[in-house]
């Protein structure tokens, strides 16, 4: 049934200047299941995720989250949390300031900032400049940002890229616990 499909992608295609990077993609994701895309660099994985959350317009086809396009949600961060680029932070802004900025821009409580910093284990470094974070701490900050709206769905693009085995294990266990 439709309620058992959290993400539905139908005939999704994306072409840039005549080069097709995603071609007639169809899939469904059910709630509570950790699902991944596998493929070589340039296969269209990131582009697909960007189309799902409305950052790239498909050439054709549709992507729906819980039956609706991402753009139709009045408070989208409460439906979908995304980590598409962990380096998307102002390097001179503290972790807490970055999250407060995102929360304020989306009408969310500042109280939630402290909660998500605790969830991802960054409370002790919340006042530190994000530009000084290690790769693993940057990934955790990206996850904290994705969790701000307490979303039903998380879309994470390469959340373990470049992490050491301990960091990979932490992200894997963290995501499994959320599912």
Task: Kindly give the residue locations of the regions a language model identified.
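Catalytic Walker B motif of ABC-type/P-loop ATPase nucleotide-binding domains
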Residues: 154-158
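Helical segment within the ABC ATPase nucleotide-binding domain
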Residues: 168-179
